[in-house]
Swiss-Prot record:
Gene3D superfamilies: 3.30.1440.10. The keyword RNA-binding applies. GO terms for molecular function: rRNA binding; structural constituent of ribosome; tRNA binding. Part of the 50S ribosomal subunit; part of the 5S rRNA/L5/L18/L25 subcomplex. Contacts the 5S rRNA and the P site tRNA. Forms a bridge to the 30S subunit in the 70S ribosome. This is Large ribosomal subunit protein uL5. Keywords: Ribonucleoprotein, Ribosomal protein, RNA-binding, rRNA-binding, tRNA-binding. Signal peptide: none annotated. This is one of the proteins that bind and probably mediate the attachment of the 5S RNA into the large ribosomal subunit, where it forms part of the central protuberance. In the 70S ribosome it contacts protein S13 of the 30S subunit (bridge B1b), connecting the 2 subunits; this bridge is implicated in subunit movement. Contacts the P site tRNA; the 5S rRNA and some of its associated proteins might help stabilize positioning of ribosome-bound tRNAs. It comes from Photorhabdus laumondii subsp. laumondii (strain DSM 15139 / CIP 105565 / TT01) (Photorhabdus luminescens subsp. laumondii). It comes from the Bacteria. Pfam families: Ribosomal_L5 (PF00281), Ribosomal_L5_C (PF00673). Belongs to the universal ribosomal protein uL5 family.
Length: 179
C-alpha cells in the first residue's frame, strides 16, 4: 500500500475532521481519481507522434492510455470527426496513490523555475487541475529517448464539496502551493 494512502487514513482524516467539524469519517473529502491527458494536435500529420505520446503516458502512469478522438470536424485545425488527436489515462486506487506520491515528492520539484503551484486552479467543486509543460520531469521518462518535449494536463478529482475543502485536502498532503 502506498505511504501516502496510509498517511491519509492515519493523519489527514483526523486533521480535516477537526478543521471542518465533520461528524462522520465518510464526510471527509478524499481523492477519487487522477486523470492524465495529453493532447497531440500534431498527430494529424504524423501518426508516430501519437504512439510516442501514448508510450510516454504509459511509462508515467503505469497503465495503457486510451486514444482520444476528435468529437467534431474543425476545418481551421484540419481535423475530421473521429481523428485520433490525444490520449488519456484515469488512475484510481493503488496506482492513483502511488502516482500522487511521485508527483508531489519527485516530479513537481523537478519543474524548471518552480515557485509553487497556483492555488487558484480549483474548479469550484474541490477538483484541482494543473498543466505540466514537459513530460521529462517524471523519472520514468528517459531524457535521451524523448523525440519531442510534450506537456500534459493533470486533474485531481476529489469528493470535496468546495474549493476550501479541496485545498485543505491537498495542502494536508504537503502539496506545494504558491504562498
Amino acid at each position: 500500500m502506498a505511504k501516502l494512502h496510509d498517511y491519509y487514513k492515519d493523519e489527514v482524516v483526523q486533521k480535516l475532521m477537526t478543521q471542518f467539524g465533520y461528524n462522520s469519517v465518510m464526510q471527509v473529502p478524499r481523492v477519487e481519481k487522477i486523470t492524465l491527458n495529453m493532447g497531440v494536435g500534431e498527430a494529424i500529420a504524423d501518426k508516430k507522434l501519437l504512439d510516442n505520446a501514448a508510450a510516454d503516458l504509459a511509462a508515467i502512469s503505469g497503465q495503457k492510455p486510451l486514444i482520444t478522438k476528435a468529437r467534431k470536424s474543425v476545418a481551421g485545425f484540419k481535423i475530421r470527426q473521429g481523428y485520433p488527436i490525444g490520449c488519456k489515462v484515469t488512475l484510481r486506487g493503488e496506482r492513483m496513490w502511488e502516482f500522487l506520491e511521485r508527483l508531489i515528492s519527485i516530479a513537481v520539484p523537478r519543474i524548471r523555475d518552480f515557485r509553487g503551484l497556483s492555488a487558484k486552479s480549483f474548479d469550484g467543486r474541490g477538483n484541482y487541475s494543473m498543466g505540466v509543460r514537459e513530460q521529462i520531469i517524471f523519472p520514468e521518462i528517459d531524457y535521451d529517448k524523448v523525440d519531442r518535449v510534450r506537456g500534459l494536463d493533470i486533474t485531481i478529482t476529489t469528493t470535496a464539496k468546495s474549493d476550501d475543502e479541496g485545498r485543505a485536502l491537498l495542502a494536508a498532503f504537503n502539496f506545494p502551493f504558491r504562498k
